[in-house]
Amino acid sequence: VVETGAVLKASEDLNDYQYISELAKRGHDHMVEVPTFVNCEYDGKPRQYFIYSRDTDGVRISGGGVIDGSEEIYYGEVREDQIDGAFYPRIPLILMEHCTHLTIQNVTIRKSGFWTTHLVGCEEVEISGVRILNNRMMANCDGIDPDHCKNERISNCHIGAADDCI
């Protein structure tokens, strides 16, 4: 629970993020196609997240507060019309894999440097009353990315992102 008035802020020190060895072994999820990056050592497979859960039941993110992704640490060149976000790997905010009865409700999620909410193979998902406020000049800061989910309902959300909103 992120209570009203509270801000859960992602660390600006990349060493603070747990390296998820299971993601490294799988690359990511076998169901997800990863992007290709030219002239970059990064292979497009995120291995660290700010908030991560796998194979859990009843996860709930709620409370009226703010989750802040600290996007500024990923800025590459800032131009008038775009931030290139050339720093890789950028840490996505939330990954839920194969979770059931997942609820994300009445929170504001802002300043994601990459994917904001990535749900992979989840079932019985309720997302409502969520505000996603990403910098519209930051590439790939998708709002909500459901991959192979079942019985998912997204309602009453406001999503501002430079890439896919849903």
Where are the regions a protein language model picked out?
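Extracellular/periplasmic carbohydrate-active domains that bind, remodel
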Residues: 1-166
